[in-house]
Amino acid sequence: MSGHSKWATTKHKKAVVDARRGKMFARLIKNIEVAARVGGGDPAGNPTLYDAIQKAKKSSVPNENIERARKRGAGEEAGGADWQTIMYEGYAPNGVAVLIECLTDNRNRAASEVRVAMTRNGGTMADPGSVSYLFSRKGVVTLEKNGLTEDDVLAAVLEAGAEDVNDLGDSFEVISEPAELVAVRSALQDAGIDYESAEASFQPSVSVPVDLDGARKVFKLVDALEDSDDVQNVWTNVDVSDEVLAALDDE
């Protein structure tokens, strides 16, 4: 559970300097476009758009790309795609549960790419509802430590509705109900604490521990899924120990 968060954080940092940067940018741009289409193009009145823009800025997406995506979503500029969100469920090797969120303009292509990635990497597709019950939708705010302690963060967010603060090594993640996400993010801002991202996510209620070989197989599958332009997010309930994580980082 926490292991997957740590791995995602590590991969995010590496993604800034490797070939996945372009795919990461594309996902962030899609988020902005969809948020503007659903809730309007003014970030001040659309918290989801505000958070999508902030995350893109933190990831060094050029401002002009961000603004064009906002305008396309809001209908101020032509060219916006008809993005649809589709969820797929399945299992990775070792019985690890996988939730796959696609944001696509072609449902058939998305379904095909997800199935191929799963099949070729030891995964199996599952019926709707047979995996998702293992996860709860939560609000997640991620922030770099920058000298902060867990108590510092808790003091800032506890009254705003935060449920938990997880230590991810170099960063913290603050968990809340999705409805409290904006309040938690605002509480951090009011306390002068900078944050990396604030978004709705899926948190596993039960985790599956794996050894080094198991972790390799799970993350090989996750990487294959994330190679699809239609896949927006992948969540698993894998639990990776610090020792296994360190061994993966060395590979």
Curated annotation (Swiss-Prot):
Its main location: cytoplasm. GO terms for cellular component: cytosol. One of its GO terms (molecular function) is DNA binding. Signal peptide: none annotated. The keyword DNA-binding applies. GO terms for biological process: regulation of DNA-templated transcription. It is found in: Cytoplasm. Keywords: Cytoplasm, DNA-binding, Transcription, Transcription regulation. NCBIfam families: PRK00110.1 (NF001030), PRK12378.1 (NF009044), YebC/PmpR family DNA-binding transcriptional regulator (TIGR01033). Belongs to the TACO1 family. This is Probable transcriptional regulatory protein MRA_2631. It comes from Mycobacterium tuberculosis (strain ATCC 25177 / H37Ra).
